[in-house]
Amino acid sequence: MLQSSFLPAWMAIQSISDIFGFHSPAVPRFNPAEATIQSVHRALLANISSPETRLTCREVVTAFLTQIETYNPRINAIISLDATSLSVADELDAWLQDSLEDDSDTPKDNSNSWSDITSLMPLYCIPVLLKDNIDTANLSTTAGCAALSGSPPPAHDAPVVKALRDAGAVILGKTNMHEMALEGLTVSSLGGQTLNPYDTTRTPGGSSGGTGAAVASSFAVLGLGTDTVNSLRSPASANGLFSLRPTRGLISRAGVLPVSYTQDTVGPIARCVWDLAVSLNVMTGGEWFDERDNMTALRPRHVRGLDYTASLSKYQGEYGGESLLGVKFGLIEGFMNRADNSETTPVNKAMCAMVCKLKKAGAIVIPITDSMYNSTAILGLDVQAYEYREMVDAYLQGLHGEESRSPRTMASLYSEIDNQEDSFLVIPHQYPFIQSALVSSPLNVSYAQKQLAINALTLSVKRTFSSLNLDVLIYPQQQNLPVRIGSRNQYGRNGILAALTGNPVVTVPAGYSNRDIFRNIPSGVPIGMEIMGLPWEEETLLSIAARIEALEKIRTPPILKAKKRKGDYGKWIENTPKVVPDRKNIHSMYPLGLYRVN
């Protein structure tokens, strides 16, 4: 991992601009809008043989920080920025310069050198944002809860964060989330309400909604989130993005403030399938078994060392064709809401259009009408409430030293007596969940009964795949558009099936609602589709997702508006800008400091 010790001693007394002989460029040299891993690397490779003129990692990171500084005040997606991101970029620049020179200071063959560099560091200089329930050693983990804002930073990076850093990524900071990852509105006592960049009257999905809104707004190339029921897929759907909820156990969940042992996962959110695959390579490339998350013991040998990008290259940049010839899709009819209204009709139209595209590309689409596939009924098997208290208690007690005054248990975190009245936020819809979680545990008889029912559900899903010889199941992530600010909850989502069975899911953009320039929705509201595969079949799943992505360019970026000024991507930033979350924009429907009706 790149740290300050990686730099030569002379770096301590000279600025990076003195070393490479460049200064603040007169014109912007890198625009972060819709940047991908490959586009960042192409920009860095241009003029690489000339230290005086080549693009630097610091300039790339500066461009993204400028994007955040300019547009985050409107959508409120960021909780905190990492003050070390620019110095890490400087380290990467110095490392690159050293790697390109031989003992006689003669530049090596550029293409071969760059290939070696990206092989060693596949995320070289890629800006990444993390959901604020994922540990980084230099930033507090708050999960959006004001009561945890004073907690000391964790002693270590989460394994997924360490993997990203070792691969050359630059961690820019932490994103807002629905507090404690318990809903999908992305409102929190510390971070306030995050707005959907496509329609600021709506929520960005959640609970990883800050990550989704940030990646959609080009605040980073990649985002990292978690998913307990919908939380990676909902923000991807609501923001026109791609996400991967991996098979439970494929990626270690250690170093993540938990909700559910049964249902939690960690995964990426990106603007293209390729970036999902690269990040998955990185996050699965370390220790094969993590004793801090014994679910990783489930990993089968055949997925060890897989290169998830290997089968994707042929589909990049090509639109149309019959790339899905013979692929069998099962369309879950029970996950559709056929009501004709302004919230559901756009979703149904987008799914109908997507099915037509799949068939035109040679796919076979089979309607699944089994009554078992009913999201509302399946939600009755959710086991979060049984596991939440014990998992949060263990995390908080393992995180904080004796001197810390931060809450050490779930009960103290939600104490209306011990805490200030604005130290936590529970939306009224969640009051019964919190009250139940405070007294429930995995020792409850009903917990065992639900686990048996989950096992039966998992077998039934496998039976559906086998009996119809399906490759994947598809359905809208949400049966309606993402809800408006102030809504009771993020209703209509279909993520519970994969959350309980542990099956992998890739979410892809499926379409948009109608544009409405008079209501300030110039791009329409995004609609996403889930593609579910069999356990450990991420390679197949990503390949199919890439072929769907290649059928037609669906993703359209939001049209961003700055609150104060537009970004200057050519300016020189000496220090990371300050970000202050807007805690005053919380809707009156969500009172602070309460979890029950008094």
Regions found by a protein language model. Name each.
Residues 92-127, 275, 316-332:
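Immediate post-signal peptide segment of exported/extracytoplasmic ligand-binding proteins
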Residues 70, 166, 217-333, 352, ...:
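Structural helix-boundary/capping segments
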Residues 54-58, 74, 119, 124-126, ...:
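Loop/turn elements at helix/coil->beta-strand transitions in domains of secreted/extracellular proteins
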Residues 124-146, 323-336, 385-462, 509-528:
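Short helix-loop capping/hinge segments that flank enzyme active sites or metal/cofactor-binding pockets
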Residues 1-97, 104-108, 333, 337, ...:
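An N-terminal boundary/leader segment
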Residues 120-266, 292-299, 332-334, 473-489:
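Short glycine/serine-rich loop/turn segments
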Residues 61, 90, 345-370, 391-403, ...:
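Acyltransferase
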Residues 451-455, 459, 463-500:
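An extended, acidic, His-containing surface patch that forms the Zn2+-binding/catalytic region
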